[in-house]
């Protein structure tokens, strides 16, 4: 267990609060700006167990008006057990600082050396002014987002009446195990990931909570608050620089918007200055020598090294050269000089040199030393700053064209089945890989995406060597595979040159007029264009929550695939230009399924192009599949000689097939990749079947034996259609359902 785990638990705590309070937009924004990983906790019960809150939970349930979230339980616990201070003038509620281990330092600390910052100043309650408090269990200030306990710093007026309160945590029995675990992690604490470091460069104010921040500001409110705390704790006699002076001396480094998720990153400009952690480095190195001798938590060997890095590295700013522009090649040389590779996304490196074994009081000096080292080493490399998208809101004319292509009319709308359908996964342990379908309609889209998710899960990445873990992914693994699958589908539809991602903004961009019926979805779309597959993957990972949890996840993917291919090319793919992608009763057409599987919305499933002579000299071209597909396709219509599925779909690159049976699409797959390249493996093999709509409660495993002949059909109505589909590829094969009830 390391600090990354602590961060994910804290983030899960905030997500649970947002979910229970119905703050859906904030919830979506948080998942976009801070995507989940394997360590994220998605169950309230699991979160309660990890934090050892069972006692508080039972006590809360017995109350007349119980609290609804774990975050409120923790908050009330501290408010009830800490007590009030004697300072009636400030009327503040102190929050204890969680001890941070230090090296062999058992001397009692003076009052001025402890860092106990009040979480909320009641005297400022009417104007909503807030202050931040040192993050529990970590010797660093790395959460300008306020994503730990939701504390945001006001830039209007700080509290100068903070009073330290020494609290005995021995009475906190129910929470002691969780907090002790946090304290003991510091010796092996990895650095903040790249995303966290990028977030540190974003200024925050009260407007960010409502998503109203339009651009960067010159300095961060938390920086000025930290400087005032330094003045009080170390009794510095010299005058510190004002924020205006710091602004003049700081160099504009990178201009990033307050909302990084699915938005474009504008280029850096000299007239919009962003306060980066590198800008803080110089002022911290100036204040450091004047701190009292109580900074014993960091060895004498470490402090000169940190100062030399800030003085010699091009990352540090000089007061005489404060107006010179920092170039990206200087940043790369800085990483090279330190012997550190620029960190990749979600990769952490150890930055703490301390090997502590006993907790002591948190000191501001330790925080500053840790902050300097992290700011230098873990600043995002230039490649992470190059993710740019071209975005534009949808307009009325484009919305009309899309509706005509989808439904054949601008007066048709998406049905409720489509609007409610997202790419959420099954909670049954043996079916965690499966996407759940709520109602009929978009089953073709779900089956195609399911096949691509299985491709990523079974045959790409780390799980391909461990068959026991393939079909039991963690929540983070399956979400990651979903993001990669969506990126593959869109990149393939865009001809592997570009992709367009359609995301719902929640606000209509135009007023419907004329022959157009609004449906509440198309009118809110913002379209993001990307021309790099790497940027596309990163972008989808940041916004995958809209596809997985909604709203309109299935619709967004369908529209993104259409726009990536372009409306004109989709029409050219059709055999009949007046065809459309969604048929009667909201069912997916073969063209839509082919678009998701192969990147082309062709109307047929045979190979290549067939010329049809009408007899009067006119030749009609029927377009089929042009190349071998990653995901295959089997159809019951072939059993009835209505169509012929070509080998490009029957023998795909991966042993995964979308099955069309009885006007419904489902998925069939094998765990053996050699099934498609070694005829000996085709003698006897297993196929797994999944239907997101069939209320499937257990794994369905079919054993196919091609050495035996299927029994004669005494009554063809009793033969499961799935068996008939299987026999369109493996002629006459015997199918054993292994105890599962055959699906008729």
Curated annotation (Swiss-Prot):
Active site annotation, chain numbering: 443, 664
Free-text function comment from the UniProt entry: Probable hydrolase that can remove 'Lys-48'-linked conjugated ubiquitin from proteins.
Keywords annotated in UniProt: Hydrolase, Phosphoprotein, Protease, Thiol protease, Ubl conjugation pathway
Species for this entry: Mus musculus (Mouse)
Name the record gives this protein: Probable ubiquitin carboxyl-terminal hydrolase MINDY-4
Metal-binding keyword on record: no
InterPro entries documented for this protein: MINDY-3/4_CD, MINY3/4
GO molecular function term, any single one: K48-linked deubiquitinase activity
């Amino acid at each position: 267990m390391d600090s990354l785990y602590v961060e994910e638990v804290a983030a899960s705590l905030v997500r649970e609060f947002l979910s229970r309070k119905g703050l859906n937009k904030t919830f979506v924004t948080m998942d976009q700006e801070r995507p989940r990983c394997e360590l994220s906790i998605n169950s309230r019960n699991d979160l309660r167990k990890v934090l050892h809150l069972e006692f508080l939970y039972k006590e809360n349930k017995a109350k007349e008006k119980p609290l609804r979230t774990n975050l409120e339980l923790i908050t009330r616990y501290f408010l009830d057990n800490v007590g009030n201070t004697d300072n009636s003038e400030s009327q503040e509620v102190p929050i204890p600082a969680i001890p941070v281990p230090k090296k062999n330092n058992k001397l009692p600390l003076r009052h001025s050396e402890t860092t106990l910052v009040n979480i909320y100043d009641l005297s400022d309650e009417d104007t909503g002014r807030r202050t931040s408090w040192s993050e529990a269990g970590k010797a660093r200030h790395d959460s300008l987002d306020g994503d730990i306990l939701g504390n945001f710093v006001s830039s209007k007026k700080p509290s100068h009446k903070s009073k330290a309160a020494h609290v005995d945590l021995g009475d906190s029995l129910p929470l002691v195990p969780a907090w002790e675990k946090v304290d003991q992690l510091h010796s092996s604490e990895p650095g903040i990931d790249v995303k966290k470091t990028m977030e540190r460069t974003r200024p925050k104010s009260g407007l960010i909570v409502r998503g109203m921040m339009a651009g960067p500001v010159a300095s961060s409110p938390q920086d000025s608050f930290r400087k005032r705390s330094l003045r009080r704790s170390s009794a510095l006699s010299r005058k510190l620089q004002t924020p205006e002076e710091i602004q003049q001396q700081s160099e504009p480094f990178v201009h990033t918007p307050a909302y990084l998720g699915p938005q474009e990153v504008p280029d850096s400009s000299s007239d919009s200055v962003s306060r980066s952690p590198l800008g803080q480095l110089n002022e911290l190195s100036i204040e450091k020598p004047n701190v009292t001798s109580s900074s014993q938590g960091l060895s004498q060997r470490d402090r000169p090294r940190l100062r030399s890095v800030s003085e010699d590295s091009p990352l540090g700013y000089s007061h005489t050269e404060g107006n010179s522009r920092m170039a990206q090649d200087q940043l790369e040389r800085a990483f090279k000089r330190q012997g550190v590779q620029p960190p990749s996304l979600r990769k952490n490196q150890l930055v703490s040199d301390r090997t502590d074994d006993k907790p002591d009081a948190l000191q501001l000096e330790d925080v500053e030393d840790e902050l300097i080292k992290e700011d230098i080493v873990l600043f995002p490399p230039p490649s992470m700053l190059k993710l740019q998208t071209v975005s534009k809101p949808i307009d009325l004319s484009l919305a009309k064209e899309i509706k005509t292509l989808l439904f054949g009319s601008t007066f048709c709308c998406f049905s409720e089945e489509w609007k409610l359908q997202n790419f959420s996964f099954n909670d049954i342990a043996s079916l965690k890989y499966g996407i759940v379908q709520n109602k009929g309609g978009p089953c073709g889209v779900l089956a195609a995406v399911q096949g691509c998710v299985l491709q990523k899960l079974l045959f790409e990445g780390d799980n391909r060597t461990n068959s026991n873990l393939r079909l039991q992914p963690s929540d983070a693994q399956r979400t990651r595979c979903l993001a990669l699958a969506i990126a593959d589908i869109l990149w393939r539809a865009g001809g592997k040159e570009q992709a367009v991602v359609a995301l719902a903004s929640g606000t209509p961009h135009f007023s419907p007029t004329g022959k157009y019926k609004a449906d509440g979805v198309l009118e809110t779309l913002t379209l993001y264009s990307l021309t790099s597959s790497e940027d596309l993957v990163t972008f989808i990972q940041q916004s995958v929550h809209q596809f997985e949890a909604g709203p309109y996840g299935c619709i967004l993917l369908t529209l993104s695939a259409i726009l990536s291919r372009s409306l004109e090319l989709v029409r050219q793919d059709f055999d009949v230009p007046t065809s459309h992608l969604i048929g009667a009763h909201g069912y997916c057409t073969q063209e839509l399924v082919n678009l998701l599987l192969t990147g082309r919305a062709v109307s047929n499933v045979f190979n290549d192009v067939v010329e049809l002579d009408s007899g009067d000299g006119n030749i009609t071209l029927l377009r089929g599949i042009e190349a071998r597909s990653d995901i295959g396709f089997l159809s019951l219509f072939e059993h009835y000689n209505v169509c012929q599925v070509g080998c490009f779909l029957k023998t795909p690159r991966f042993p995964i097939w979308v099955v069309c049976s009885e006007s419904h699409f489902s998925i069939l797959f094998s765990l053996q990749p050699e099934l498609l390249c070694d005829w000996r493996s085709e003698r006897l093999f297993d196929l797994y079947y999944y239907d997101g709509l069939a209320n499937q409660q257990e794994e369905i495993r079919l054993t196919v034996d091609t050495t035996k002949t299927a029994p004669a059909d005494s009554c063809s109505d009793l033969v499961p259609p799935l068996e008939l589909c299987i026999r369109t590829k493996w002629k006459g094969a015997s199918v054993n359902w292994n105890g599962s009830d055959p699906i008729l």
